[in-house]
């Protein structure tokens, strides 16, 4: 499914992340690349049938990238702790404890899976044999 991918700017918009000056593209790019590969592997032979489904694939890629980037983003805020009060005023992202981080990552993964649910489905039935 060549041609369907996202970039760091898409991830910044989706997650309302800080700009390049506060959070460099090099921090987010590996997570975007990983998410694109992960979503394409999940889809396998399924191909989006229209523009709306392509948008859902891109949304899933962004959601997976957010889930993958959360630990790094949390570390970014921890390492910048003395600057956090000023930065919190500039962004919606805040520091999370370990439990919150796991829940938030699961939320983003589930949102991504939900976006992929109907992509490339024909609406037919599937037969299963139990032996």
PLM features: what roles do these ranges have?
Residues 1-58, 107-131:
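Conserved short "hinge" loops at termini or chain/domain junctions
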Residues 59-70:
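Elongated alpha-helical scaffolds
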Residues 2, 68-131:
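Short loop/turn elements at secondary-structure junctions
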């Amino acid at each position: 499914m060549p041609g369907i991918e996202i970039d760091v700017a898409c991830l910044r918009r989706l997650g309302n992340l800080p700009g390049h000056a506060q959070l460099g593209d090099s921090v987010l790019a590996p997570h975007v690349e990983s998410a694109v590969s992960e979503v394409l592997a999940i889809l396998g032979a399924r191909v989006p049938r229209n523009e709306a489904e392509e948008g859902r694939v891109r949304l899933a890629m962004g959601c997976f990238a957010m889930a993958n980037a959360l630990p790094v983003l949390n570390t970014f805020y921890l390492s910048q702790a003395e600057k956090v009060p000023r930065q919190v005023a500039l962004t919606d992202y805040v520091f999370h404890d370990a439990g919150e981080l796991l829940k938030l990552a699961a939320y983003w993964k589930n949102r991504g899976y939900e976006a992929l649910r109907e992509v490339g489905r024909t609406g037919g039935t599937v037969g299963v044999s139990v032996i």
